[in-house]
Regions:
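Membrane-interface segments at loop-to-transmembrane junctions
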Residues: 132-141, 163-174, 200-211, 238-252, ...
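Alpha-helical membrane-inserting segments
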Residues: 120-124, 128, 225-229, 262-265, ...
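Transmembrane alpha-helical segments and their short flanking loops
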Residues: 294-303, 340-398
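Gly/Ser-rich, low-complexity
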Residues: 2-118, 122-141, 155-165, 169-170, ...
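Mid-bilayer segments of alpha-helical transmembrane spans in multi-pass integral membrane proteins
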Residues: 142-155, 174-191, 211-223, 228
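Helical hairpin unit composed of two closely spaced alpha helices linked by a short loop
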Residues: 313-354, 362
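Generic multipass alpha-helical transmembrane bundles of integral membrane proteins
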Residues: 197-322
Length: 398
């Protein structure tokens, strides 16, 4: 238990540290924003950068997953390049909260079905003495429990599909989004970062996506099945095995998160520092060793690189928005159903048999684990995009 608590404490520290690092990586976007109209970016140069950039794949994901209230991707990109964020943060928070309660309300039917069956099982249990034998009461309980299992498996399988779909879409998005960022890294002078990140990111995203979908999710589903079977009878003790599988999923996720975050952050800091030094050296050489036009040439190079870095930051923030949109809606659905099971377990505890309450509560815990899994993968990819944004930011290269 102590080791488990220490691991949770370590994960909490990791989350806080990553939030600080990601916040720092997003500072370039804020610093790049103009303070007044006189500091507005060169529209022609920005348009030239955008014309040479293929964001059609990113636009498809944006159109599929972004809210209807959001502006189109072209307008959003230009607004961000001018330092304007066309979003109402409080409205987004309200939409998320209302979406959670809406999902809970839509699953009231699930609570009703479980409550009716659980109450029937409780009544039959109280009337057990009127049966000719104890086995008849057990048979009545088994009948009710099988009905509950059918309801639980149907909803749990649907939540698993939401989780698998979210993970697949996040991996596909990262595979479509990364080439654009690599192109902008090269344009902004981060050649080393692009060369180092491209194979590494492709490998990490593919490995994490495959591992979570093909290993962790099936183990989690098997844990849920064993949990349901375990509570059918006291003579089928499978609770420890179900807990073991759930703990394996938890530890595998935590280990994957730590390894992924450490590799991406260390790689980003190392490559970014090297590119910054390389660019400053090249700028100094052109400025001092090219006769007559050296100064003008180095200033022009710095301007082009700065605008490329600015476009990269804006594209990166749009990527974060799309990634959040892909993750949040399935995560909200999963969290809502988890709350429904937890609420149902608490509600029927006074009248239903303990085995039914424990079953529903355990399924709620597994759904919370599924929510954590989807959210953690999104955070990993979020870190990767934030590191790409932070490499060769305008204030770092000038």
């Amino acid at each position: 238990m102590k080791g488990y608590l220490d691991m949770n404490r370590l994960m909490l520290i990791m989350y806080i540290s990553i939030i600080i690092i990601v916040s720092y990586m997003l500072i370039p976007v804020a610093y790049a924003a103009p303070d007044d109209e006189g500091a507005m970016p060169d529209d022609d140069l920005i348009q030239q950068q955008l014309d040479n950039l293929d964001i059609s794949e990113i636009a498809k994901f944006y159109e599929n997953f972004a809210s209807e209230d959001y502006p189109d991707i072209g307008t959003l990109l230009k607004d961000m390049l001018r330092g304007r964020i066309p979003f109402d943060v409080w409205q987004i928070i309200k939409n998320l909260v209302s979406g959670l309660f809406k999902e809970v309300w839509q699953n009231i039917g699930l609570i009703s079905n479980v409550l009716i069956i659980a109450i029937a099982a409780g009544i039959l249990n109280q009337l057990q003495s009127s049966f000719d034998s104890k086995s008849a009461g057990e048979m009545a309980f088994y009948a009710c429990y099988i009905l509950i299992i059918m309801v639980v498996i149907q909803s749990f399988r649907q939540m698993m599909n939401y989780g698998q779909e979210a993970l697949s879409n996040m991996v596909l998005f990262m595979q479509a989004f990364a080439p654009t960022m690599y192109t902008l890294l090269v344009a902004s002078g981060a050649v080393s970062s692009s060369v180092m990140f491209q194979p590494l990111m492709a490998l990490l995203v593919g490995v994490v996506g495959t591992f979570v979908k093909d290993v962790v999710l099936p183990l989690l589903f098997l844990s849920a099945i064993l949990t349901l079977v375990n509570h059918i009878s006291d003579k089928a003790p499978l609770g420890k095995l179900a807990d073991l599988l759930k703990n394996i999923c938890s530890w595998a996720l935590k280990l994957t998160f730590i390894i992924f975050s450490a590799i991406v952050i260390i790689q980003g800091i190392t490559a970014g520092s090297f590119d910054s030094v390389s660019f400053r050296t090249a700028k100094f050489a052109v400025d001092n060793f090219v006769p007559v036009v050296g100064r003008a040439l180095s200033d022009s190079m710095a301007t082009v690189v700065s605008y490329s870095a600015l476009v990269k930051s804006a594209i990166g923030v749009i990527g974060l928005i799309i990634l959040a949109s892909i993750c949040l809606f399935p995560a909200i659905k999963i969290a809502a159903v988890a709350l429904v099971y937890k609420f149902a377990a608490a509600l029927i505890e006074p009248i239903a048999q303990p085995r039914i309450c424990q079953c529903l509560n355990s399924i709620g815990d597994i759904l919370i684990m599924l929510f954590t899994l989807v959210f953690s993968v999104a955070v990993m990819f979020f870190i990767a995009i934030a590191m790409l944004i932070g490499i060769n930011s305008p204030q770092a290269i000038l």
